Amino acid sequence: MSTSTKWLNEVKWDENGLVPVIAQEASTGDVLMFAWMNREALQRTAETGNAIYWSRSRRKLWHKGEESGHVQKVVELRIDCDNDVVLMKVEQVGGIACHTGRHSCFFQKYLADGRWETVEPVLKDPKDIYS
């Protein structure tokens, strides 16, 4: 990979120096999760080939899968037409992206009667993932 970081200057970072990131499973097109990256996280993600996010609550870099083993191997990075959203196509190791033990964080579906319904099963109990 190139050691140049000029490409990072093309990203439109928000007022907090962050960019929203959508993680999409490369093989299925499933949207797995939404998170944030700062400049260092995006650069290190590109360099290592593993997803590294910025945790807004903990105010530190977060290596996806560092506790669970459910790492995301980056297949492709894209940026939208306004350069302010990153799409990251990934291979989701272990098939679980969500801390709830589900494949995707988007496991609730809106129904016409005004309710949210859980439509994806828990694949592994979070207590077994994070113990």
Curated annotation (Swiss-Prot):
EC number: 3.5.4.19
Cofactor(s) the protein requires to work: Mg(2+); Zn(2+)
Family, as annotated: Belongs to the PRA-CH family.
Function recorded in the entry: Catalyzes the hydrolysis of the adenine ring of phosphoribosyl-AMP.
Lineage of the organism: Bacteria, Pseudomonadati, Pseudomonadota, Betaproteobacteria, Rhodocyclales
Keyword Magnesium tagged: yes
Subunit relationships: Homodimer.
Pfam families, sorted: PRA-CH
EC primary class: hydrolase
GO biological process, one term: L-histidine biosynthetic process
Originating species: Azoarcus sp. (strain BH72)
Location in the cell: Cytoplasm
A cellular-component GO term for this protein: cytoplasm
Catalysed reactions, as listed in the record: 1-(5-phospho-beta-D-ribosyl)-5'-AMP + H2O = 1-(5-phospho-beta-D-ribosyl)-5-[(5-phospho-beta-D-ribosylamino)methylideneamino]imidazole-4-carboxamide
Keywords from the named record: Amino-acid biosynthesis, Cytoplasm, Histidine biosynthesis, Hydrolase, Magnesium, Metal-binding, Zinc
Note on cofactor: Binds 1 Mg(2+) ion per subunit.
Protein name: Phosphoribosyl-AMP cyclohydrolase
GO MF terms held by the record: magnesium ion binding; phosphoribosyl-AMP cyclohydrolase activity; zinc ion binding
Domain of life, source organism: Bacteria
Binding site for Mg(2+): D80, D82, D84
Keyword Translocase among record annotations: no
Pathway the protein takes part in: Amino-acid biosynthesis; L-histidine biosynthesis; L-histidine from 5-phospho-alpha-D-ribose 1-diphosphate: step 3/9
Binding site for Zn(2+): C81, C98, C105
